[in-house]
């Protein structure tokens, strides 16, 4: 019969722990190797796939450099713009060297808070070679503070911005005025002109009212009153004749 002493048991237990640790380390190493092999295979497959399909992908060509465009530019310009009855009318006369007879251009109007772009029609060629741009925009904001034209002398040139500050345009006797005109004058701080326009409108409406009253009185006295009197006389005559017959 074998007797297990305490020293023998501790020795046996020590060697069991060593064996278990060795086996666990080998299993971890094999698992790490298998995981690394899977990752390497996945990365190699992901690298190989695009190369196999690279023949079907067409890369864009590198853009060629533009030539010398320093000669294309806007040399001078004259602008005129105004607002009347809520309609913005603007015109620009542009001179310079352009690569095309109708260079690309667009317009912008707005104020300090917002801006709105609009299309500009084809320019008109003047006798001296200048280009004339004209535009007419209805129902614009009465508080607009600027309108500008952006012109590109060539396709690769920097833009040239031509500014213009519109002002309200009214005749010396403003008989026809819209609320937009009054709002525009108030926004421009032309208070004296604003009061003058209001006074003219007040006098105009008073004159129209008095004229209407006079026309109504004339019509009544000329046609309506004689017709009413004649009708009363006719009815009175017929009533008297009927009374005489009854008697």
UniProtKB/Swiss-Prot annotation:
Protein task: Influences cell-to-cell spread of virus in polarized cells. Promotes dissemination of virus across cell-cell junctions of polarized epithelial cells, maybe through the association with the cytoskeletal matrix.
Domain Ig-like H-type stretches: 72-168
Spans through the membrane: 193-213
Disulfide bonds: 81-164
Gene: US9
Location relative to the cell: Host endoplasmic reticulum membrane; Host cytoplasm, Host cytoskeleton; Host Golgi apparatus membrane
GO annotation (BP), single: symbiont-mediated perturbation of host defense response
Cytoplasmic compartment segments: 214-247
Protein's UniProt name: Membrane glycoprotein US9
Keyword terms of this UniProt record: Disulfide bond, Glycoprotein, Host cytoplasm, Host cytoskeleton, Host endoplasmic reticulum, Host Golgi apparatus, Host membrane, Immunoglobulin domain, Membrane, Signal, Transmembrane, Transmembrane helix
GO CC annotations on file: host cell endoplasmic reticulum membrane; host cell Golgi membrane; host cytoskeleton; membrane
Main localization (coarse): host cell
